[in-house]
């Protein structure tokens, strides 16, 4: 994708602050011909984000209310995108959460905690992706970029490197990575079987790293969110196929790197 490419319709979930906001900020300046759909659970916070982005030079922004755990919101978002644009070129599944330092006090709380993480980071990614798949298939080169974490890499977790240990969050990201691989294989098999003429969706996983945002309580050693957005923006802009799909990618020390499973 370069400045001469046709307009892309890009939807980012969880985009009113933090990483999602930074993705639209960085991509909007780099690829100004695109239209960016900013999704937010709180419409007022979403409106504030849109104003801030426009002040920073990102002009083509649409706002959609979307709680990824709410099926009515998802269905309404799909209807909006279909009515306004007729297709979707890039879906960035960014919405997520973590509770650092949280301790469950009983088994019921523990079960509820795990269910909430899995619902947001696995089930909702699957449901949102499924809901938008017909619109993605109308794109000439559709992409889905799922946002993971270093805690989603089993290799990294088993290494001695310094990492925050949040088992329910990390396990949910491991699951999301696995889901992404399965979705890519299913899409490959659909194309190979000749069941439909729709273009193949390319699925990617992006690890933005630990960021200095509200998500991490603005942890002191975190990267700026714009730096974390770089891997997502580069995957978004890859039209030459230089990045393998269904792989985990990060942007560190000025280059894109594959993250081990």
Curated annotation (Swiss-Prot):
It comes from the Eukaryota. Pfam families: adh_short (PF00106). The keyword NADP applies. One of its GO terms (molecular function) is oxidoreductase activity, acting on the CH-OH group of donors, NAD or NADP as acceptor. Transmembrane segments: none annotated. CDD domains: carb_red_PTCR-like_SDR_c. The keyword NADP applies. NADP(+) binds at residues 19, 67, 94, 169, 173, 213. Induction: Expression is up-regulated during co-cultivation of A.fumigatus with Streptomyces rapamycinicus that triggersthe production of the polyketide fumigermin during the bacterial-fungal interaction. Gene3D superfamilies: NAD(P)-binding Rossmann-like Domain. Short-chain dehydrogenase/reductase; part of the gene cluster that mediates the biosynthesis of fumigermin that inhibits germination of spores of the inducing S.rapamycinicus, and thus helps the fungus to defend resources in the shared habitat against a bacterial competitor. The partially reducing polyketide synthase fngA alone is sufficient for the production of fumigermin. FgnA catalyzes the condensation of 3 malonyl-CoA units to an acetyl-CoA starter, and 3 methylations to yield fumigermin. Belongs to the short-chain dehydrogenases/reductases (SDR) family. This is Short-chain dehydrogenase/reductase AFUA_1G00990. It comes from Aspergillus fumigatus (strain ATCC MYA-4609 / CBS 101355 / FGSC A1100 / Af293) (Neosartorya fumigata).
């Amino acid at each position: 994708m370069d400045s001469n490419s046709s307009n892309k319709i890009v939807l980012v979930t969880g985009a009113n602050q933090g990483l999602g906001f930074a993705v639209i900020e960085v991509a909007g300046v780099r690829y100004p011909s695109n239209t960016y759909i900013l999704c937010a659970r709180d419409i007022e916070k979403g409106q504030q984000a849109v104003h801030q982005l426009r002040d920073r030079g990102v002009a083509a922004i649409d706002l959609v209310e979307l709680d990824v755990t709410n099926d009515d919101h998802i269905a309404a978002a799909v209807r909006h995108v279909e009515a306004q644009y007729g297709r979707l070129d890039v879906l960035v599944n960014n919405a997520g959460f973590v509770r650092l330092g949280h301790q469950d006090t009983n088994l019921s709380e523990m079960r509820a905690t795990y269910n909430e993480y899995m619902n947001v980071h696995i089930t909702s990614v699957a449901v949102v992706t499924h809901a938008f798949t017909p619109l993605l298939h109308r794109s000439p080169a559709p992409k889905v970029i799922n946002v993971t974490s270093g805690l989603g890499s089993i290799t990294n977790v088993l290494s001695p490197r310094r990492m925050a240990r949040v088992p329910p969050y990390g396990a949910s990201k491991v699951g999301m990575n696995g889901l992404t691989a399965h979705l890519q294989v299913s899409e490959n098999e659909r194309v190979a079987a000749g069941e439909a003429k729709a273009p193949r969706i390319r699925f990617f996983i992006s690890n933005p790293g630990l960021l200095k945002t509200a998500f991490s309580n603005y942890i002191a050693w975190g990267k700026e969110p714009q730096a974390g957005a770089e891997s997502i923006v580069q995957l978004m802009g890859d039209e030459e196929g230089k990045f393998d799909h269904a792989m985990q990618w990060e942007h560190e020390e000025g280059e894109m790197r594959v993250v081990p499973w």
